Curated annotation (Swiss-Prot):
Belongs to the WD repeat PROPPIN family. Interacts with TECPR1. Interacts with ATG16L1. Interacts with ATG5. Interacts with WIPI1. Interacts with WDR45. May interact with NUDC. Interacts with ULK1 and RB1CC1. It is found in: Preautophagosomal structure membrane. The gene is Wipi2. Keywords: Autophagy, Lipid-binding, Membrane, Phosphoprotein, Repeat, WD repeat. This is WD repeat domain phosphoinositide-interacting protein 2. GO terms for molecular function: phosphatidylinositol-3,5-bisphosphate binding; phosphatidylinositol-3-phosphate binding; phosphatidylinositol-5-phosphate binding; protein-macromolecule adaptor activity. It comes from Rattus norvegicus (Rat). The modification Phosphoserine is found at S395. Component of the autophagy machinery that controls the major intracellular degradation process by which cytoplasmic materials are packaged into autophagosomes and delivered to lysosomes for degradation. Involved in an early step of the formation of preautophagosomal structures. Binds and is activated by phosphatidylinositol 3-phosphate (PtdIns3P) forming on membranes of the endoplasmic reticulum upon activation of the upstream ULK1 and PI3 kinases. Mediates ER-isolation membranes contacts by interacting with the ULK1:RB1CC1 complex and PtdIns3P. Gene3D superfamilies: YVTN repeat-like/Quinoprotein amine dehydrogenase. GO terms for cellular component: autophagosome; cytosol; membrane; nucleoplasm; phagophore assembly site; phagophore assembly site membrane; protein-containing complex. SMART domains: WD40 (SM00320). WD repeats lie at residues 182-222, 228-267, 311-349.
Amino acid sequence: MNLASQSGEAGAGQLLFANFNQDNTSLAVGSKSGYKFFSLSSVDKLEQIYECTDTEDVCIVERLFSSSLVAIVSLKAPRKLKVCHFKKGTEICNYSYSNTILAVKLNRQRLIVCLEESLYIHNIRDMKVLHTIRETPPNPAGLCALSINNDNCYLAYPGSATIGEVQVFDTINLRAANMIPAHDSPLAALAFDASGTKLATASEKGTVIRVFSIPEGQKLFEFRRGVKRCVSICSLAFSMDGMFLSASSNTETVHIFKLEAVREKPPEEPTTWTGYFGKVLMASTSYLPSQVTEMFNQGRAFATVRLPFCGHKNICSLTTIQKIPRLLVGASDGYLYMYNLDPQEGGECALMRQHRLDGSMETTSEIVDSASHDCPLVTQTYGTAAAKGAYVPSSPTRLGKGQDANLEAYTDDLGAVGGACLEDEASALRLDEDSEHPPMILRTD
């Protein structure tokens, strides 16, 4: 999530961007001084696994699962996308576009570049533009979502700037899959589950979260976040098993919903006056306006999180760390917050730890709750240890003039300029392994 304002102003700690990778095993952070990756394998320790200071003002940094492939955009060149191998410290290729890059999404098949009024679909093996979705409704926030599933490889983006229509696009067959009328208000957040068969949506009003089947577009679940006030939804995130959905906003509360079908019980004749009154009340809902009837059928939060702040941009993730379900929240205040989630009972989640994301030497904060924590906590400082374990990238390798002559340049009609990779290396690529990365060796300026 882009944590900077429209003017490029950073949040606390000079943070410009934060996002979890596709399987929630690492966190990428972009800042005024460069970008970093943190491992999410432990609650007590936030291990910095890489830091790069060669590129300043990093406003987008997206990692492909746990591989070495990373896509980078800088505020100094907001129309240029760099694709790098961060462990080798090499730039694999770059592309320039006709307008500012607002978002980049990756999976093992495709790389999506979102501009305000167009979307570019790249083949991640050679970075060639396969398709361009032109003249999309104005999308200044760069809102879009890409499924991480190889078989259900769908892209979702707003189909209107005035109402909450979702366009679903098949990025493998390069054709429109569906249009979902999700909300009356414009869209604010989108998220696919790991299987690519469910899509969660929220509107700018922020009170109702809906989940649709993909590609059919059938409404599966509807959850009410609240009725007292409208909020700005910051992020939606499914757990990897698709059983839970989290929704964070500009308020201090994160809601976690449980996606389980309601089992209908056979009707029973009421034996008391209270039971009879309840039956009459439920029957009367068929005569109420549809908006009121929907409120009777909307699910409520299974669990909640109380954040120690309000008003900060943030991004949430549901993951499993050390065999325990956790909710993680990265915020523009410069911290990563870790909470425990009880998958059986729900309720209010306990804050376990909060870690600084700016690499400072400040001691990691511990929050001890003996009733809910899985093991004793010990306060430690991890800045020095993380720095010792970080990779130190060498200067990026650049192709010589002789190599440039052997590569065929690629130019898209709307201004995406880049090049092609070698076919022999592409054919040997195995993108299902995290150690692999697309064998692109070109560079364009």
